[in-house]
Amino acid sequence: MSVTTSFGIWLNHINLDNQASFLYNNPHFCNRRFNRISMLRTVSLARNRLRSETPSSFLARDRLRSKTPSSSPFSSKRHTPKTSEIEEESTPKDSVLLNPKDPSSAPKLFLVQPRLAPPKYLQAKLNEALCLANSLEEQRYGYFESDFFDKELPSHVVVQNPVRRSSKPRVDTYFGSGTVDNIKCHLNAEDSKEEVDAVFVNAILTAIQQRNLERIWAKPVLDRVGLIIEIFNAHAHTKEAKLQAELAALMYNKSRLVRVRGTDGRHTFGQFGEAEVVSARGRAGSKGTGGGFVGGAGETELQLQRRRISDRRIRLLSQIKEAQRTRLLQRAGRKKRVGLEGESSGTIAVVGYTNAGKSTLISALTKTALYCNERLFATLDPTLKSAHLPSGNFVLLSDTVGFISDLPIQLVKAFQSTLEEVVEADLLLHVVDSTAPNIEEHRSTVLHVLNQIGVPEEKLQNMIEVWNKIDYEEDEVEEEKYLDDGEGVGEEDEDEADLKAEETVDASEATVDEDQIQNGDGDDADGWLLSEDENADDPEFWKVPEVAKVDAANKKGPDVRVSALTGVGLKELLYLIDDKMKEKKLKSPTIVERSELHKRKWRPPRNDDEEERLIPLDQR
């Protein structure tokens, strides 16, 4: 102990004694708020605190004050450290910085595509994943900074699919150790260019797999569902779309509340990723108390964040219900106007796979400038436009959100209020991209989602299937004429050779003992993550049900082939819609026109006895 520190402590003792004796001998200072007993207790506690503070305790206290507190998105702002204090602290090795390196531009993702067979199907899935990665961009001042086709393709790598090798992927990292190291080498090469903000794995990962991959790669990791939610948040413009996108994010993030290693937790990625926080043993354990409880309520951090997410979800559902009520009133008003002065013949919902050309087709049929974009999920709100039919009537065409494969039912339920326009429509128009190599999968996905939201079977049987983009299909046929007959020979053999090579690399560490992982005995094991809540990371929660098989006997082919850009087949489509609406009107003869209702005068119903009693006796 230095002389200066000892002298300071001794001087504080003298000042404290003088103040105590002065207050004790002058009762005028002991007013109604402070009596002598409370004053003596205060002096005694102050002395004990001063004696316990040695120079080492002063240094320890200074270190604690200079440390950055544990970050929590739901913590109060007054406990948030300043930016200068955060920059002074060195970033831990396990922490992940999820902020884009260039805030003015869209996040740049690195795509990891599991290998699929046959190669044509792999190419289709790879193209869809690249479009998803490039679609993650938010509009600035009402428009995107660059055209979709002018953007560079994201860096990507095709790796071994663990589902093909075994019936079950690894429970800790999804991929084998050799594949994980291979991806890390690619990331290190891309980091030299400083072009990667996050890693997009085109598969559905559990919370533990996502956390372990983030720690190994030192990069944020987004799976297929997480990226789709981010795109929903970026493309939502109206109030209802933003509410539904936030609801989908909350339902997804509630299952991602798992504990991370490190006192600082980790930053988040995206608009609503802040719901993912340090959980379970949380704040009380990080403060050195050794317990897993917060305050005196006995509530863990995991339970606290779940309760807050549930409360927010209830508020969102109430606001969405108000918007749903408004749509219900609008639909009721449209139905009342059906048949009045030939105003409308009904409503037609245009459904289909994402980026199938639904908005472009509606713009061509209605001769309006509807918003169209090549990005996936460009339309999130239903938009009504009127189209004139050859019979002289006109119908309302409703543009809806596009569907996509491997989408859990939880996300479909988040957009239930918007998809009610599809259920309540008089006729369905299914738009199919004729250039898609996996066109049967697109058709099956759309039919499966329609069954999930409760579309009646009668509407599905009466649905019109339109194959769009036939102009691109003709261009592809012309290009195939000039292809070399020997081109492509041996590609499958090369893929099989690469597959065997990757299996050889991962053979030593491909299989993982699940009991060892759950007990936390392995090096990369995170079984302790499941100790607090096993249901939160249950893969069955976000498991995508099998797509319903399409009955080929019901659909022999498309009802009509069109090109929304060139206008080919649009007239034939309008005639087909007119015939369908006439058939629907003939099948519903009990519908009474509104003009006749106004001419009637309501009278209470009478039975036969009352009618007989009202007839005069001489006329019976």
UniProtKB/Swiss-Prot annotation:
It is found in: Plastid, Chloroplast. Pfam families: GTP-bdg_M, GTP-bdg_N, MMR_HSR1. GTP binds at residues 352-359, 377-381, 399-402, 468-471, 563-565. GO terms for molecular function: GTP binding; metal ion binding. Residues 346-585 form the Hflx-type G domain. In contrast to other GTP-binding proteins, this family is characterized by a circular permutation of the GTPase motifs described by a G4-G1-G3 pattern. Belongs to the TRAFAC class OBG-HflX-like GTPase superfamily. HflX GTPase family. This is GTP-binding protein At3g49725, chloroplastic. It comes from Arabidopsis thaliana. The lineage of its organism: Eukaryota, Viridiplantae, Streptophyta, Embryophyta, Tracheophyta.
